[in-house]
Amino acid sequence: MLTSKEIRESFKTFFASKGHKIVPSAPMVIKGDPTLMFTNAGMNQFKDIILGNTEAKYTRVADSQKCLRVSGKHNDLEEVGHDTYHHTMFEMLGNWSFGDYFKKEAIEWAWEYLVTVLGLDPQRLYATVFEGNPEEGLDRDNEAASYWAQFLPEERIINGNKHDNFWEMGDTGPCGPCSEIHIDLRSDEERAQINGLELINKSHPQVIEIWNLVFMQYNRKADASLTPLPHKVIDTGMGFERLCMALQGKTSNYDTDVFQPLIRTLATMTGIGYGEDSTSDIAMRVVADHIRTIAFAITDGQLPSNAKAGYVIRRILRRAVRYGYTFLHCREAFMYRLLPTLIDTMGDAYPELQAQRELISRVIKEEEESFLRTLETGIRLLEKKIADNKATGSTVLDGVAAFELYDTFGFPLDLTALILSENGMTVDESGFDTEMQKQKERARNAAAVEAGDWVVLREGESKFSGYDFTETETEILRYRQVKQKNKEYFQVVLSDTPFYAEMGGQVGDSGQLIDESGVAYDIFDTKRENNLSVHLMKKLPESTTDTFVARINQDKRRQAEANHTATHLLHEALREVLGTHVEQKGSFVSPEVLRFDFSHFGKMSPEEIRKVEELVSERIRADFQREEFRDVPIAEAQAMGAMALFGEKYGEEVRVLKYGSSVELCGGTHIPSTGMIGAFRIVTESSIASGVRRIEAVTGIGAERFIYEKEDILLAVKELFNNNPNLIKSIKKMLEEDASLKKQIADMKHERMLKFKKSLLEQDVRRRGIRLFLFQEIMEAETAKDIAFQIAGELQESFVLIAGTTEGGEKCALTVMLSKDLTEGGMDAAKLVRSAAKHIQGGGGGQPHFATAGGKNPKGLPAAIQQILTEAELTD
């Protein structure tokens, strides 16, 4: 039986023998494509080639691509763990042809690999072909069917509709018919009873698609019409985990050697055997799947967070923790302990897992611990809602409350339903679904982008000349109109542009496009989309066919360049001061500020921050000249000392920037010499995730302003101390005096409180046999609370304390304390306070024995106190 490692290598070996260039997997986290957060198919890294924006370096390519599908069209998240073949992170084996071979070779080689090389039973294989679509004038794909007829009988070549057998990149763009290969893994007895033909595309767990061959031959325009592609593309994708299942004779992907090591480790950790119970089995599958996704995302530079791609990763991690908490009884962080097993399983194919081991482990552990605390808070909130419902006789938790638990505390509906069922209650699922739909609609509206078709004025590739020039003569190659969030603008592609498109953390250039008559049109930003430099303009030139001058805003560019070069010097200084474990984890470079994220497991000391600043400043004063090396082979660049960053996609040739001993792989723009940075100051140093720190810094004019602001503060403080030459001594003396005075005040307050409490205890006011303490005073609410708890600790009889306090001005408070016997009898301080708070224009709450309310209408205190007395039946 082939192992998963052997299967992966056999695929690469086979297609290498067919003249394919074997390329490494692209990062799972996508940069430079606004339509995608994650790589969800093998074709993503070749999208710019398929769109015609970049010329293919190789016409035949194959790889094993790590993918993630959790959102949008490919939303598999809720299926994961509940069936045998859905995953969040999976590997896609694929082969591509860019204008080389087409359907014949794609089909013949797929069959040869599956049957001849791997030895799959041909009697278990089926192929689907596109049946055609008369509405769009598309005929049946008889060409593909004829090639399949070489290997399969006619009855196992199945017509498929547009939904299943016509692949589209999106609403617009390259598309075409596809041919899926399905395999029937059922036993001979089952196959004899029901023909596999009846189960194709019917979600049967053992009659599954394993390979999709896409024949891209059309381009879908914005008006939905189709035009032929000038260069046809083959794009195939085969689910690696499903292939392993078929070859290893399993009935579930999770029973293969891809997942079983993780599941066995999990069983050992929890003491729960896999196969003992369906709910714990689902939980184990969820955890085994999700730990892979989370680890690879962190490896590729995407940390869990509350925004965009980071939020998706956090959701996946929390889903795994919830399943572990609910069904595997994991009350402490546990997922990070699976990392050694994952590395043993996949570390050979993806060595970055081992290289980033400590960071991945720390990030996951901290995220788990944080969410477990949140989970406990959510459970307490749900318990309160259950108690409130029981008090009113309701047995149904409303959908809004259930959705709040989901949205705020990460409670899935099934966990809420489980806890409710244990308390004889149910949840309003319809109301929950309504709230979920509202949220999805809000998200869709916020992210909706409508892009028209490209208006192509001239054919040709766009050239970037911004490393050498700040203005160039150019022409418009193409443009299109875009609508987003009720705003309209144009995307413009130029034949030759000095504008740097936002990439690698550096913001895009702004500037002007100047026509032949001298009229300037603003370019407010430049973005990178599918390997195109796209210039954003609110208004198009009147004549788009003119020759133009493209001119960047040089001041902003130069400031951004200074900040970008400073990040290189900062990176080197951090590694010198903190150690070589420091690696860049992200950056942001604008004309105003630079932000640098790096791996490090502790807060930097003031001395370390000062040392880093000094090292960067030394290199600025040294005025190192920029040494630039373009089109350097990646291995040669690394031999020069440049470090490749995890999560970045590099070509075979790269650009190297050198300033003194600082050597970096970088595609950004940089100043000619370090002296032009002028000055460098670190503004903040903070944590953004476990094991990842962030420095924000300023350079040049920004650094000068930062220093001036500090000086202004210092001068203002000196002035407050009458320009005393020994300012630190004066401040220390003031703090000592302040502490002494505060202690005297606290002692006086305490003494006053004791006297006031004594006077209360000397009174003996009783109503219905209950001792009543009633007062309205100018006093802090905290003092009233102290009095209440001291009296409660000293008395052994029934009592009620009601206090109305003001601190001067409009602030006021109500305080109510009840003895234990009264709360056991049904009296509730929180309800009394909430009811009376309206008189003081405030609100409050608490527990049955003690509650407070704050308000802004002291004149209402007498009425509030009277209402409490009335409701407690303690009036005269």
Swiss-Prot record:
Written domain comment of the UniProt record: Consists of three domains; the N-terminal catalytic domain, the editing domain and the C-terminal C-Ala domain. The editing domain removes incorrectly charged amino acids, while the C-Ala domain, along with tRNA(Ala), serves as a bridge to cooperatively bring together the editing and aminoacylation centers thus stimulating deacylation of misacylated tRNAs.
First-listed, main subcellular location of the protein, grouped into a coarse class: cytoplasm
GO MF term list: alanine-tRNA ligase activity; aminoacyl-tRNA deacylase activity; ATP binding; tRNA binding; zinc ion binding
Residues the entry annotates as binding Zn(2+): 564, 568, 666, 670
Name of this chain's protein: Alanine--tRNA ligase
Compartment list: Cytoplasm
Similarity comment: family membership: Belongs to the class-II aminoacyl-tRNA synthetase family.
Record text on cofactor binding: Binds 1 zinc ion per subunit.
One cellular component (GO) term of this entry: cytoplasm
UniProt-listed SMART domains: tRNA_SAD
Cofactor(s) needed: Zn(2+)
GO biological-process terms attached to the record: alanyl-tRNA aminoacylation
Gene3D superfamilies: 2.40.30.130, 3.10.310.40, 3.30.54.20, Bira Bifunctional Protein, Domain 2 (3.30.930.10), Threonyl-trna Synthetase, Chain A, domain 2 (3.30.980.10)
Pfam families (UniProt xref): DHHA1 (PF02272), tRNA-synt_2c (PF01411), tRNA_SAD (PF07973)
Lineage: Bacteria, Pseudomonadati, Bacteroidota, Bacteroidia, Bacteroidales
Function according to Swiss-Prot or TrEMBL: Catalyzes the attachment of alanine to tRNA(Ala) in a two-step reaction: alanine is first activated by ATP to form Ala-AMP and then transferred to the acceptor end of tRNA(Ala). Also edits incorrectly charged Ser-tRNA(Ala) and Gly-tRNA(Ala) via its editing domain.
CDD domains: AlaRS_core
Keywords: Aminoacyl-tRNA synthetase, ATP-binding, Cytoplasm, Ligase, Metal-binding, Nucleotide-binding, Protein biosynthesis, RNA-binding, tRNA-binding, Zinc
Reaction(s) catalysed by this chain's protein: tRNA(Ala) + L-alanine + ATP = L-alanyl-tRNA(Ala) + AMP + diphosphate
E.C. code: 6.1.1.7
